[in-house]
Amino acid sequence: MKPVRRGQTDTALDISSHAKTNGDFIKKMNTTDSKRLKLLEDLKGKLEVECKIRDGAETLLQVFDTNFKKETKERKEMLKKKCTDELESSKKKIEELVSSIESFQGENGEAKTGSTSLTRSASATVSRKSSLQEKYSTRFSYKAGCSDSCSVTVSGTGELIGPTRNAHSNLTPTVIQRIDFENVNEKNNSSSEDTQPNGKRPSSLQSNFSQFPLNPWLDNIYKACLEGSMKDVIDSSNNLCEYLHEHSDPAYAKNFSLITPTILSMLELNVSEVTASVYRLLRHLFLDATAFSCCQMLNLPWILSKSLLSGTDAYQIEREQAFRLIRTLYFLSSTEGHEDYLSGITRTIISICEHVSDVSRGIAVETLIELMIIRPKILFKANGLRVLMISLIDGSISENLAASAALALVYLLDDPESACYVNLPYDIGILLSPFTSSSSRDTFNSSEEQSEQAAKAMKSSAKVASVLLNSWSGLLALSTNDFQALRSIVDTLRVPSFAPRSDVIDLFFLIFQVEYSSWSESFLAGKRLTVVKNQAVSNDDNINMVNIPDGSNKKYMSLRQHFTAVLLFIFLELGLVESIVCMIRASDDPSASRKATYLLGEVLRLSDELLPIHLGAKIQSLPSLFNMASQFTAEDRFVATSVLQSIESLNRVKFHSATQPFSQTTSLLFKEQKTDGSFRGQRQVEHVKLKMGMQIDDSHFRSMLAETNVLATKNYQKWRWDTLVQIMEGPLLSPKRIDETLRTTKFMRRLLAFYKPFSNRFSSIQNTKPNQKFIKVGCLVFRTLLANPEGVKYLSESKVIKQIAESLSQIDGYSEQVSEPIFSNSRLQKTLTHGYFPMLKVLSSQKEGHAIMERWRIFTTLYHLTELRNRDDLIIIFLTNLDYRLEGHTRIIFSKALNTGQQAVRLTATKHLAALINSESANDNLNHWAISLLIFQLYDPCLEVCKTAVKVLNEVCARNENLLAQVVQLQPSLAHLGEIGSPLLLRFLATTVGFHYLSEINFIEHELDNWYHHRNIDYVDLLEQNFFLSFVSNLKIIDKKNNEPDENILPLHFYGELVKSPQGCEVLESSGHFESFMGTLVEFYDKPLGNEAIRQLKSALWAIGNIGKTDQGITFLINHDTIPLIVKYAENSLIPTVRGTAYFVLGLISRTSKGVEILESLHWYSLMSLMGTSQGICIPRHAGQVLSTPRRNVEFVNERVPTPEFSSLLSSLTNSEREVIRLVSNLSNHVLTNESARQLTKIRSKNAKVFSSKRLVKACMTILGKFHYRVQIQQFVFELFPYSVLLSSSTSQDLNESPSRPNNLSISA
C-alpha cells in the first residue's frame, strides 16, 4: 500500500470542493450592508483558489504520461479521468464565481474587473507563523544507500512516507494540496509587506518570483516551513529534486536570489533531515561556478563544516548529503578564489581523516582521494596530502580503497604540474613506513586487537607499494634521490632483529606477481617436494598463446614482462639477492627461511628469463652462497648447501609441472605445442617401450591377461586398469596377439560388454576425476581394434556400437521417445555417458571407423541431432569430439551445425575450428577446409560469432604465413564489419598479394589518412587502457573478466604492418608521415607539454617503434638517426609515462639485429635467446640511466600571514572578542588546549552575547580555515556559537536565535 501524505487522499488527485454554487451566494446578497464587502472578498479569494486548481490540473495533464509512467494502465486511466473531471469542475466554478462577482459589483456600483486578471492573479508571500518556535516531535527516517536521486523521507507514525520517484513526485503543489480559505485571506493581507529575515520575502522579488519556473515548489516549501510541517518540507524538497534531476537548467543558477529565502527558511528550522534536504537540493541546483555566489549568501562552508563535525548517528543523513555537496563544490571550483573559499571545509575533512574512530572517516578519505585527482592544489594548500597518505597505511581502511588511492597518486605524479605538490621522496616514503620502521610492529605488541591492526596496515602498505611499483609514475617517484625509498626496503632484510622481514618477502612476491601453486605451498609448509608431471587436458576455452604481435612465428616478450625486467634489474642492483641470503643466514624462523629461499629461486628464474646475459650472469652464479658452501670449516655451510638444494628442487619441480606464469593470456584459440628436446626424447622412449611390448613371449602375454582380472570376474572394480592400458598400447597391437585374444578368450567380449550403454555399468559411473581412466581405456580399446582387420570386423559386429547408435536415436526426434534416455542432460553431467563421444572420435579418425558408423546409421542420427533446438549441450559435445581429417559425413555435419545451429553452437564451433587448425594432426586439407568455414562465419548474423571468427583468422594469420596466404587468396569482404575487421585486413599488408588486394579496394589510402589524423592517438589510448586494466586486475583491485583485454597482446599498428612489404615501404616514404613523426619528437623534446601534446608525442613514439620493429622499417630510423633521440626520451623526459613509452619503444626496436647493434652502442643491452634471436627486451647498463630522478623540493605556501581583510576584521573587534580570538588560537596548541577551553566555557557562561557577534564568528571561522585543529577542537568551537549566528551574515539584520542543537562544551584533552 502506498504511503499517504498528510492532508491528502490516497490518490492525491481527489480534490475536495471549497466553493459553493452561485445560488448559495445569491442568498447571502440579502444580508446587511456591513457584510457585503466581506462577501465580495470571499468570492475573490475562492476564485483565486479555483484558478490555481485549474492551472495545476492543466499542467498535470500536460506531463501526465511522464509522471505516472510507473503506474498500471487501469490506474493511469482512473487518475487521468479524475484529473479531467476536476479540471472541468474548476472551469465551471470559475464561470459561476466570475458571474457572481460581476453581478455583485454591479449592484454595489463598483468597477468591474476583467476575468482574465482575476483568474491569473498570484498569491503573495505569507508571514512567518509562531509555530516555527515550537519543538517538533516528528520521527524521521531515511532510505540509506540511495543514489543521486535518493530522497529524505519523514513519518510521524513509523511508516516510510514518499516521495522517492513515485507517481506523485512532480505534481504541481496547488493540485496536490488545496489552500485553505483562511490562508488565502492571510496571504492577501500580507501581500504588500516586504519579506524580512523573520520569514518574509522582499517585495522587490515579487514580480520575478511569480514568473520563476520553480515557483510552485519553492512556494510550497516556504509555506511548509512557516507551518512547521517537517514532513511537507521534506516531501516538497524531494519533489523539487526529482524535477531538477530530470529538467536541469543552468538558467536556474542565475536566480539564486529567488531561491535563497526558501533555503534560509529550511536551514532556520535546524532539523537534521531538513538540512540534509537543503544539501541535496543545492547539489541539484549547482551546475557551474556561479554556485559559489549562493554559497556566500548562505555561509555554506560554515554550515557544511558544522554538519561534518556532528559525530552522532542521528546526523548520519546530514553528513552524507554534506559530503555529496562538498564533492560537487570541489568539482565546480575553477578559480583560486574558489579554492581559498573551500579551504575551511577541506581542513575539516582532513581532521576527520586524522580521527581514526570517526564514523565518517571512510567517506572523508574517499573525498580527499577524489580531491587529489580533480583539485590537488586545494589539498596541497591545506597540507592534506601527508595526512591522506598516513590514513592509507594505518590499517583502518580497506586494502582496495588504499589501492584506489595509490592509483590516484599515480595519476597525480604523471602530470608535472600536479606532481610538484608531492614532496619526494619524503611524502611518498610514508607509504612504505610499515616496512621500514621498526616501531611499526613493536607498537602493536600490547594486545591482540592492535596486532591485528598492524597486520592490516602491512597489507594496505603492501598493496599501495605494489601499485606504485607497477606503474612508471610510482616507480620514478620511489627512485628519487638515488632510490632511497627502495633501498631502505631491501636493506630491512639484512637486519636480524627487524620483525616485519617476512612481510617484506610477501611484498616482493606481490611486486613480482609470483603465483603460488600446490607444490610451492607444500614447500613453504615444510613438506617434501615430489615431482608430478603435468597432464595437459585440452580445453578450447583456456588455451595459451604467446605474444605474436608482428605476424611471424617469432615469440617476443610482452610489455608486462618488459616492465618486470627493469623492475627486477633495479632491485638486483640494490642488492636484493645479497639481502635475501643475509636473511636466510641470520633467520631463526624456518618458515621465514623457506619463504626467502622460494623468493630467491623466483628471482633467479626471472633474471634468467628476462635479463640479458651481460646483466644476469653475475646474479645466476650466486657467489656468496657458493663461497659459503665450498668452505668446509664455515658454520653456515649447511645453510648454503640446503638453500642450493632447495632451489634446484624447486626448479626441477617447476619444469616438470610445466607452469608458465607469463604465457597465460586471454587467447581462446591456441595452445603452445611442446617441441623442446625433452618432449622429443619422451616420445622416443615411448616408441621404444611400445616396440618392446609387442615382442613379449606367449607366457608373458597370458600372464598379463590374467593380471587384468578381466577373465576372472565381471566386476570392473576388481580389474587392473593400469595393466589394461599396457596391454592395449603394447601386445594387442600385434595382429597375432589380437587374433589369438579374440578367438580363444572372452577378454575383449567381456571388456566391450562393460561399455554397452544399456548394461548401465560404464554409463552409470559417476563423473569424477579418478573415473576418467575408464574413458581413456575405452578409447584405447577402439583404437586397438581399428588397428587390425580382425579387430575392425569384431568391433563392427559388436553390440556396443549398435547400442550407442540406439541411445543416440532415443533423442533425435525421429524415433520413439523414452522417459530416461542415455544421453539426457543430467546423465551427461553426472555420469561418464559423455565418454562415448571420445570413442566416436576414434572411430571417425579412420576410414574403417567411418564404415562402422555408416553401417549403424550413426551419421544419420547426428544429422537429426543438429536440428534439435533444446539440446545445445549435446550438439556441442559431439561437434568437439569428432575427427575431421577425413572428408565425408563428419565435415558435412559440422558445416550444417555451423550454419543452422543456435548461437551458442555456432560460437563454440567457430572456436573449435581454431583448435583444429592448431592440432598436431592438422594437415593442409584440414586447414583449408577450416579456413573456408571461418571465412563463411564472417557473415554470420550474430556479431559475437563474427568477432570470434575475425579473432581466430587474425591469430591464424599471425601464426603461419602459409595460412595467411590462403586467407588472402579467398579475398574475404569485411566492409560490413567496420572496425571489427580492421585487424584482419591489417594482416594482409604483410604480403604482396594482400597489399595489392587492399590497394584495389582503396583500403590503404583510406587507412593511411585515418591513422595519421586519428587512429594513432586512439592506438595510444587503447594500449594504455589494456595495460591499466590488466595491471589492476593482476593486483586484484578489480575482478578479472573473461572479455578483459590482455596486455600481453600488442595491438596491430597500421604503420608496423605497412612496412613489412616493399610496396608498403614505398607508400610510407612517399607519404612523408615518418618525417612528420620525427618532427614531433624533435619539437616536443625537453618542453612542457599539455595533455593533448603528450598524447600526440606518445602516438609518434609508438608509430616509430612499430615501424622500427621490422627489418625493412628499421632503415627509416637509421636514416633519420631516430634511436638516439628515443634513448634521450627514455632517460631524461620529465613525464613518467612518456619515459615509459620510450622504454617500450626501444624494446620494439631491439627485435631487429640492426636495432640491437645500435642500442648496444648506446649502452643498452638486449635479451637474446639461445639461438641468438632477440626477445624484444632491452635494459640500460645502469638502472639510474632511466629511473633515477633528482630530489624535488616543494615550494612552501605560507597562508598564515594575515590578509588585509582579516587584519581589518581583527581591528574592529572589541576587547572581549579579541580575548575569544586569542583563546581559540591557543586551542591548536596541545599544551594550552585544556586551559583555553575552560576559559572559553567560562566566557560563554558569563557573557553569551559575545558569541552572537557576526564579526567574531567570521574571525573564528577564518582561523579554523587557516590552521590545523583536531576534530574535537573544531566541534567545541562550533558549539560555542548559536546556530543562528552562522546564518546571520547572509541577511541584512540579525536573526533571532533559532532552537539550536544541544551544546556540549566539554572536550577531552
UniProtKB/Swiss-Prot annotation:
Recorded family membership: Belongs to the RICTOR family.
Per the record, membrane topology reads:
Multi-pass membrane protein
Q: What processes does the entry annotate via GO biological process terms?
A: meiotic cell cycle; TORC2 signaling
**Gene name?**
ste20
As for subcellular location, the record says:
Membrane
| Post-translational modification Phosphoserine, affected residues | S151
Task: State the name under which the record lists this protein.
Answer: Target of rapamycin complex 2 subunit ste20
Spell out the Polar residues composition-biased ranges: 113-128, 194-205
Where are the annotated segments for Disordered?
105-128, 183-205
Q: How does it assemble?
A: The target of rapamycin complex 2 (TORC2) is composed of at least bit61, pop3/wat1, sin1, ste20 and tor1.
What residue ranges are annotated as transmembrane?
A: 285-305, 392-412, 504-524, 564-584, 926-946, 984-1004
- GO cellular component entries: cell cortex; cell division site; cytoplasm; cytosol; membrane; nucleus; TORC2 complex
Q: Which residues form the REM-1 domain?
A: 24-110
Q: Which PANTHER family match?
A: CYTOSOLIC REGULATOR PIANISSIMO (PTHR13298), RAPAMYCIN-INSENSITIVE COMPANION OF MTOR (PTHR13298:SF11)
Q: What does this protein do?
A: Component of TORC2, which regulates multiple cellular processes to control cell growth in response to environmental signals. TORC2 is required for cell survival under various stress conditions. TORC2 positively controls G1 cell-cycle arrest, sexual development and amino acid uptake. Positively regulates amino acid uptake through the control of expression of amino acid permeases.
* Residues where Phosphothreonine is found: T1203
Query: Origin organism of this chain?
Result: Schizosaccharomyces pombe (strain 972 / ATCC 24843)
- Could you confirm whether the keyword Transferase appears in this record? no
> What modifications follow translation?
Either Ser-203 or Ser-204 are phosphorylated as well.
List UniProt keywords, sorted A-Z.
Cell cycle, Coiled coil, Meiosis, Membrane, Phosphoprotein, Transmembrane, Transmembrane helix
